[in-house]
């Protein structure tokens, strides 16, 4: 198997996950900024790998498999770290909700693909808005330089949680006939 640049970017994102986790735990004042910057770098590769794969017509089965896995693991790890830092139900609840949604929708997409109806649960615009709010929340909450930035991050986390539910229900509604078919 020959790896192309988009796939290398996805692999780079996977490799970055333990580095931003490690940076989170470093006992230095600059550690939160370092953690957030590594997360941003990894998140940018998420946009870039897909863009390049489509632009250069280099989509592969391996890339199509690995990209969403890398995204989900990266976001789940960041949510776990944020929940651990704040150590409160009002952060853990939206974080856990988002992780649960990712698992549910990933399973739904896999199942819909098995029955030949993957396009019924393709990524929607609301899913893209949710991802944007989620990334804003995670970057600010991993960085958290002051109460204002943390407040913006918490607000974005709740916006992302609401959009998480909205998009999940959209996907489930789109698949309802297949899910509840006799």
From Swiss-Prot:
- Keyword Lipid metabolism in annotation: yes
Q: What is its main location?
A: membrane
GO MF, one term, reads: CDP-diacylglycerol-glycerol-3-phosphate 3-phosphatidyltransferase activity
Q: Which regions of this chain are Cytoplasmic-facing, per the record's topological domains?
A: 1-12, 82-86, 169-181
Q: Which top-rank group of organisms is this from?
A: Bacteria
Localisation: Cell inner membrane
Keywords assigned by UniProt?
A: Cell inner membrane, Cell membrane, Lipid biosynthesis, Lipid metabolism, Membrane, Phospholipid biosynthesis, Phospholipid metabolism, Transferase, Transmembrane, Transmembrane helix
Do you know which InterPro entries this protein is assigned to? CDP-alcohol_PTase-I, CDP-OH_P_trans, CDP-OH_PTrfase_TM_dom, CDP_ALCOHOL_P_TRANSF_CS, PGP_synthase_bac, Phosphatidylglycerol_P_synth
The segments annotated as topological domain Periplasmic are 38-60, 108-145
Instruction: Give the membrane topology.
Output: Multi-pass membrane protein
EC annotation? 2.7.8.5
Note the coiled coil stretches, chain numbering.
none
> What role does it play?
Catalyzes the conversion of cytidine diphosphate diacylglycerol (CDP-DG) and glycerol 3-phosphate into phosphatidylglycerol. Essential for the synthesis of anionic phospholipids, thereby playing a role in balancing the ratio of zwitterionic and anionic phospholipids, which is thought to be important for normal membrane function.
Family the UniProt entry places it in: Belongs to the CDP-alcohol phosphatidyltransferase class-I family.
The name on file for this protein is CDP-diacylglycerol--glycerol-3-phosphate 3-phosphatidyltransferase
Q: Which source organism does the UniProt entry give?
A: Sodalis glossinidius (strain morsitans)
Q: What is the lineage of its organism?
A: Bacteria, Pseudomonadati, Pseudomonadota, Gammaproteobacteria, Enterobacterales
């Amino acid at each position: 198997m020959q790896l192309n640049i988009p796939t290398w970017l996805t692999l780079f994102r996977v490799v970055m996950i333990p580095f931003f986790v490690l940076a989170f735990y470093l006992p230095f004042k600059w550690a939160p900024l370092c953690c957030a910057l590594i997360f941003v770098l990894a998140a940018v590769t998420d946009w870039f790998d897909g863009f390049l794969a489509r632009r250069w017509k280099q989509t592969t089965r391996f890339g199509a498999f690995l990209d969403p896995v890398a995204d989900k693991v990266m976001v789940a790890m960041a949510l776990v770290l944020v929940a651990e830092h704040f150590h409160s139900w009002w952060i853990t609840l939206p974080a856990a909700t988002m992780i649960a949604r990712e698992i549910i929708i990933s399973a739904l997409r896999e199942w819909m693909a098995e029955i030949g109806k993957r396009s019924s649960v393709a990524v929607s615009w609301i899913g893209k808005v949710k991802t944007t709010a989620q990334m804003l929340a995670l970057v600010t909450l991993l960085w958290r330089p002051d109460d204002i930035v943390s407040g913006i991050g918490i607000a974005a986390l709740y916006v992302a949680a609401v959009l998480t539910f909205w998009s999940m229900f959209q996907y489930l509604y789109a698949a309802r006939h297949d899910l509840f078919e006799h």
